[in-house]
Amino acid sequence: MPIEANASLRSLAYDALKRAITEMDIYGTLEDIRLDERRLSQELGVSRTPIREALTLLEQEGFVRPVPRRGIFVVRKSKREIIDMIVVWAALESMAARLAAARAPAEDLAALRALFEEFRDEPPSEHMNEYSEANIKFHQTILRLSGCELIVDMTENLFIHIRAIRTVSLRQDHRAERSMREHLGIIAALQARDADLAERLTREHTLGLAAHVEKHGVFAE
């Protein structure tokens, strides 16, 4: 979608490119993912100058990397780096769950449970795209319901990789069904205002993803 010219074109291009990278299946293939300046310029409806400036910002943040005579590529992390990121995420999200147990309005927790209502009658593995989106929304909502902006900010630059890894992992080793059971357990703890249990279940759930990546993850190193 072309971006409007009533704001900084560089900022708009940056936001559009970062959002696009976030939504990419960057760990679903071992092939390098190249970003084409000309194509991006055409798709966003801006000149290549703000595209280059936006890519420079993304490079500084570690999301893309230039390769001489080849172009700009999306950065993918090694297995060790991914596991470390998941461990950090587990610490932050489990604290968010503890805070949410005390702070989150009851209606927001009910809405969190409602995310999974459509998957009660049929296994989530039969609706992977929809369940994957619900899964991502669940984890982002836990962070938001903590009421702690610092936790939200600290997870922002991890999100691109964590989202992509969760999307791939849900399709492996029957993780979708297990994921939903664990989500419902976390929600029950939140609704019971049991901060200790909510924190523990959230930590165990996310560290389970780290263990899965350790066992099953295949990455281009």
Which residues does each PLM region occupy?
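All-alpha effector-binding/dimerization core of bacterial HTH-type transcriptional repressors
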Residues: 76-146, 174, 178-201
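Short linear motifs at protein or domain termini
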Residues: 1-98, 102, 218-221
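A short secondary-structure junction motif
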Residues: 20, 24, 28, 119, ...
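C-terminal all-alpha effector/ligand-binding and dimerization domain
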Residues: 160, 164-221
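C-terminal regulatory/oligomerization modules of transcriptional regulators
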Residues: 137-138, 145, 151-167, 211
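Juxtamembrane/interface motifs at transmembrane-helix termini
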Residues: 52, 103-106, 130-132, 151-152, ...
